Amino acid sequence: MAKESVKARNLKRQALVERYAAKRAKLKEAGDYLALDKLPKNASPVRVRNRCKITGRARGYMRKFGISRIVFREWAAQGKIPGVIKASW
């Protein structure tokens, strides 16, 4: 389980990215990299880390489901993810 402060920091970054998205796109289109450099560092989408919605784990993240591999495995075994069944051959 990730620390609450790390999760909160990532949420703050996501909010900044959303807030400055239009401005960043406009500046990039114009090629004004000096003005782009003046924006907050955390306004860049590259700084946001994909994290599990349940545990906050950063590694082993599955984009399609928004959860980590560990939570995915548990939920799949319990049948909580529709359409996912354990492979058998």
Swiss-Prot record:
InterPro entries: Ribosomal_uS14, Ribosomal_uS14_bac/plastid, Ribosomal_uS14_CS, Ribosomal_uS14_sf. GO terms for biological process: translation. Pfam families: Ribosomal_S14 (PF00253). Keywords: Ribonucleoprotein, Ribosomal protein, RNA-binding, rRNA-binding. Transmembrane segments: none annotated. GO terms for cellular component: cytoplasm; small ribosomal subunit. Gene3D superfamilies: 30s Ribosomal Protein S14, Chain N (4.10.830.10). GO terms for molecular function: rRNA binding; structural constituent of ribosome. It comes from the Bacteria. PANTHER family: 30S RIBOSOMAL PROTEIN S14, SMALL RIBOSOMAL SUBUNIT PROTEIN US14M. Belongs to the universal ribosomal protein uS14 family. Binds 16S rRNA, required for the assembly of 30S particles and may also be responsible for determining the conformation of the 16S rRNA at the A site. Part of the 30S ribosomal subunit. Contacts proteins S3 and S10. This is Small ribosomal subunit protein uS14. It comes from Amoebophilus asiaticus (strain 5a2).
